[in-house]
Amino acid sequence: MAQVHLTIFIFSSIFVISSSSFIPPPHPFDPLTETELKLVRNIINKSYPIGHNHKFTFQYVGLNEPEKSLVLSWHSSPDRNVKPPPRQAFVIARDKGMSREIVIDFSTRAIVSNKIHVGNGNPMLTIDEQQAATAVVQKYKPFCDSIIKRGLNLSEVVVTSSTMGWFGETKTKRFIRTIPFYLNGSVNTYLRPIEGMTIIVNLDQMKVTGFKDRFTGPMPKANGREYRISKLKPPFGPSLRSAVVFQPDGPGFKIDGHVVRWANWEFHMSFDVRAGLVISLASIFDMDMNRYRQVLYKGHLSEMFVPYMDPNDDWYFISYLDCGEFGCGQTAVSLEPYTDCPPNAAFMDGIFPGQDGTPTKISNVMCIFEKYAGDIMWRHTEAEVPGLKITEVRPDVSLVARMVTTVGNYDYIIEYEFKPSGSIKMGVGLTGVLEVKPVEYVHTSEIKEDDIYGTIVADNTVGVNHDHFVTFRLDLDIDGTENSFVRTELVTKRTPKSVNTPRKSYWTTKRNTAKTEADARVKLGLRAEELVVVNPTKKTKHGNEVGYRLLPGPASSPLLVQDDYPQIRAAFTNYNVWITPYNKSEVWASGLYADRSQGDDTLAVWSQRDREIENKDIVMWYTVGFHHVPCQEDFPTMPTMFGGFELRPTNFFEQNPVLKAKPFNLTTIPKCTTKNE
């Protein structure tokens, strides 16, 4: 009888936590509830009429960052019996063509701060105004005439929005470009672009202010672009066996509101319309000290820079700052149980206001689950003891918090993985659909140009070269807020002639503690060094400073020249690692106003002050980079490409923190079969 082994892991039932159901007093980092968002709208509506006939729109609404000292005082108090910090909302709105910043206090139910933004750049685009802009284009007569002139069916045309960037203009208006695509037998929208049109929409006036048609070559065909399993035809494959996920005692983690407790970890997870998934107040329990110790005060996506490498008119402006322009929370999607997240996952909803301030919910926008991947936590076989052979192995398990944000054609998987050993892994997965351009070629032998700026991935279709730079903001509090950044260089030494050895060389370490921000800017790969955030006021019993080490993934750095306009706006990618002193206003690496920004309010600009960072409350910024030269395997959808980094305890514990972890049982069961099978 043929048998299939199904691995039993964990599960009781899928359950969902709705952020609108929590009862005050909330955790200081809880996302704004539906009730609070309605209150924000009502309070603002008393001062600024809101509605279809008024030019007042909500571009961003989120929790106004409470004072860190108050949060830590509340968090460290026994049973959280200290009054939590004042709860406030931060609002960016458009008001008659201006960007207005408003702070609302919930205890007084009043506006406590109100000012007009006077610098460069615009706030995040809303979904509503992007949809309105594309609707305007689809009714614009010159556009419709161009579509008909091409012999295309207007009803099969889809128009998408694209930011315009900045290319040296002294003043910029709130314009976007729109890009048309043709369906006509395909639902893979982004693989059939209609090129040769420049269509500019003024968002404040909601009208087309620029249109030009330069009719260009053939359109990619619709065939070969299907990706829905229900529409694909046999043969199917490769064949994968099913797995059963079962946990009779329920999941190993507990969720109290937005606070997650699992194994030796405790942390808070929430949702922000710009950042998406936010992890706060992550602490790990130290068995030797019998208490929780701080690791991460707050960590989240800060920005994603995605420049494309075609300098021609249809492409040069595509240099997205995804979080700042489109909102990585606003574009987050509902996760599919059993596929986006395994059956042992718990889910949380996300709530944010629409353009008119009305709350909108994304169901199942975040998930959390225990991950059993067959990895080994630690092991050792001892065969040198006479008469004994000892083998000790511990299977590994970790806890993963995940979200997916779909920004146009790309789906980004963002996850934080907590390990019992004390490590936190931050991961970024890239999948979705290529952004392509039509060409007359179907084979490389036909190419006439010096550069097609990409790869032929299908008939008449080039996948355009591009980059992804994903920047995380990590406010590390390693066993407290007084931290330093240590760069330990691995230096090759010649063996002294005075040493009686055949060895000619060895390496040793040279420790450098960064004094100011300039000392802490790191381009990975230039030299062998270890990067550690330490607490110089806390030491192990052997005298080592407690710390957490950065373990980078494969590093990529920008290849654009530094005076290129997209790179000026994204100068925060010039280094893989930055360290800055904590400043609650320095949250977004591209600046608070990223759309059409000019690079004058970015992480790179803040860091030019070269502030002191030794033995201070410091923040680490880390950029995960990808250079993407498309290939045929990326068509019609892309297998996930994964990158990331790890924060790993280094002299944080007195010994291996999982030494005494007991093995857990994993088992398999045979497949039930009939006699005739």
Curated annotation (Swiss-Prot):
GO biological process terms on file: intracellular arginine homeostasis; nitric oxide biosynthetic process; primary root development; putrescine catabolic process; response to abscisic acid; response to auxin; response to jasmonic acid; response to putrescine
Subcellular location(s) per record: Peroxisome
Broad class of enzyme this protein falls into: oxidoreductase
Factors inducing expression: Induced transiently by auxin (IAA). Accumulates during dehydration recovery, wounding and treatment with putrescine (Put) and jasmonic acid (MeJA). Repressed by abscisic acid (ABA) and salicylic acid (SA).
Record-listed substrate binding positions: 320-331, 407-412
PTM characteristics: Topaquinone (TPQ) is generated by copper-dependent autoxidation of a specific tyrosyl residue.
Disruption phenotype: Decreased nitric oxide (NO) production in seedlings after elicitor treatment with 2,6-dichloroisonicotinic acid (INA) in root tips and salt stress associated with a reduced arginine availability but with a normal nitrate reductase activity in plants. Reduced primary root length.
InterPro entries on file: Cu_Am_Ox_Cu-bd, Cu_amine_oxidase, Cu_amine_oxidase_C, Cu_amine_oxidase_C_sf, Cu_amine_oxidase_N-reg, Cu_amine_oxidase_N2, Cu_amine_oxidase_N3
Cofactor(s) it depends on: Cu cation; Zn(2+); L-topaquinone
Residue numbers binding Cu cation: 466, 468, 628
Disulfide pattern: 341-367
Protein's pathway: Amine and polyamine degradation; putrescine degradation
GO cellular component: nucleus; peroxisome
Disulfide bond found in the keyword field: yes
2',4',5'-topaquinone modified-residue sites: 410
EC number of this enzyme: 1.4.3.21
Residues binding Mn(2+): 477, 617-618
Signal peptide segment: none
Organ and tissue specificity: Expressed exclusively in leaves.
Active site: 322, 410
Keyword Methyltransferase appears in the UniProt entry: no
Function noted in UniProt: Copper amine oxidase that can use putrescine and spermidine as substrates. Involved in putrescine catabolism in peroxisomes in response to salt stress. Regulates arginine-dependent nitric oxide (NO) production, a key signaling molecule regulating a wide range of physiological processes including responses to salt stress, by influencing arginine bioavailability. Modulates primary root growth.
Family from the record: Belongs to the copper/topaquinone oxidase family.
Name of this protein: Amine oxidase [copper-containing] alpha 2, peroxisomal
Organism: Arabidopsis thaliana (Mouse-ear cress)
Gene: CuAOalpha2
